[in-house]
Amino acid sequence: MISVIISGHGDFPIALKESSGMIFGEENNLIAVPFFKGEGIQTLQEKYHQALKDIPEEHEVLFLVDIFGGTPYNAAASFIAEDQRMDMAAGVNLPILLEVLSLREHLALKDLLNNLKAMSQQSFQVCSEHLEKVKTANQDTREDEL
């Protein structure tokens, strides 16, 4: 089982957790750790330390943070460097969190991260590209009817 700590600037991790709850319901071992204006990296590391106390020893731990190289990322990196059962992915969004929640009971952490790499490219979509595909398909259908 993989426990998840979502972290990021402001209320972002709290909102992300609430949004996932609207879709999947309440999840165990999903912890939101916000980083607020005026807090330093030591404060955030203490929040992580407190969150980790609530996670069973046998669980792997995935930190999902908003920005690569930001304070939430840097604070988590110090824990990951000390514990091989932990890792992190930056650039979290709702589709990525939902993917994690749907797979975390079935995959090991490294396998889950590999899935996320592939999935993250698919979660970013441009509407006009899809509309163009529909338009082209409709034109092809009309031409076939003639």
From Swiss-Prot:
GO terms for biological process: phosphoenolpyruvate-dependent sugar phosphotransferase system. The keyword Repeat does not apply. GO terms for cellular component: cytoplasm; transmembrane transporter complex. The modification Phosphohistidine is found at H9. Residues 1-124 form the PTS EIIA type-4 domain. The active site is at H9. Keywords: Cytoplasm, Kinase, Phosphoprotein, Phosphotransferase system, Sugar transport, Transferase, Transport. GO terms for molecular function: kinase activity; protein-N(PI)-phosphohistidine-sugar phosphotransferase activity. Induction: By fructose and LevR. Pfam families: EIIA-man. The keyword rRNA-binding does not apply. Its main location: cytoplasm. It is found in: Cytoplasm. The phosphoenolpyruvate-dependent sugar phosphotransferase system (sugar PTS), a major carbohydrate active transport system, catalyzes the phosphorylation of incoming sugar substrates concomitantly with their translocation across the cell membrane. The enzyme II LevDE PTS system is involved in fructose transport. The EIIA type-4 domain is phosphorylated by phospho-HPr on a histidyl residue. Then, it transfers the phosphoryl group to the EIIB type-4 domain. This is PTS system fructose-specific EIIA component. It comes from Bacillus subtilis (strain 168).
